[in-house]
Amino acid sequence: MQYASALSRIPSSNSTSASKGPMAIALSATGTGQIQLWQFLLELLADAVNAHCIAWEGSNGEFKLVDPDEVARKWGERKSKPNMNYDKLSRALRYYYDKNIMTKVQGKRYAYKFDFQGLAQACQSAILTNGGNPNGDLSSTVHSLSPYTNQVLPIGVTSRLSTSMSSYHSILSSTSSTSSNQIIPPSTATYWSTPQSSLTYTGMPSSY
């Protein structure tokens, strides 16, 4: 599976032209059937052409499904599920509440909010799953995954997500020096270091 990162070009405060700003990672999978819903939503949000159906609300990670039926249709099209509708989509979104990837904005219809820390962990997991190096520079790792560099994300979303990614990356780096003996339970490590001649097997026919 290929992954694409939305490396944003952030408009400056005094200009409408886009200039490359801090890294905002929004992993989205290309190909058939592998993309996750949170990745797909970030993909839609990263492209202004989708503003008619989904758009950011401010710079704190909040977004609104302007046309929830259209978002559901697009999701169904991507996943080859023609019967997809908003009811099914919203049930899938609720799954992310427990994962701390996003929450429902109370008092606002069709409004949701990404949790930057949870999203950072989800992005990091996606990188590692696809061969990224947790000990290397995160921005370099993400950049190597994708040629896409022209998506636009709100500057607040960019900076907050970048900060969360860096914080989570530091946590991973600090734990990566753990030795294999510490990671593998003692009993398991002892088993694999025991000469086979000393192991006794019972209850299994000799013909196997």
From Swiss-Prot:
Localization of this protein: Nucleus
Cross-referenced PROSITE patterns: ETS_DOMAIN_1, ETS_DOMAIN_2, ETS_DOMAIN_3
Known DNA-binding region: 35-115
Tissue: Expressed in a subset of head neurons, including the BAG sensory neurons, the AWA amphid neurons and the ASG sensory neurons.
Gene inactivation effect: Lack of CO(2) avoidance behavior. Down-regulation of genes required for BAG neuron differentiation and function. Reduction in exploratory behavior and an increase of animals in the quiescent state. Unable to sense downsteps of O(2). Increased intestinal fat storage.
GO annotations of cellular component type: nucleus
Protein name per Swiss-Prot or TrEMBL: ETS domain-containing transcription factor ets-5
Organism: Caenorhabditis elegans
Lineage, highest ranks first: Eukaryota, Metazoa, Ecdysozoa, Nematoda, Chromadorea
Annotated gene: ets-5
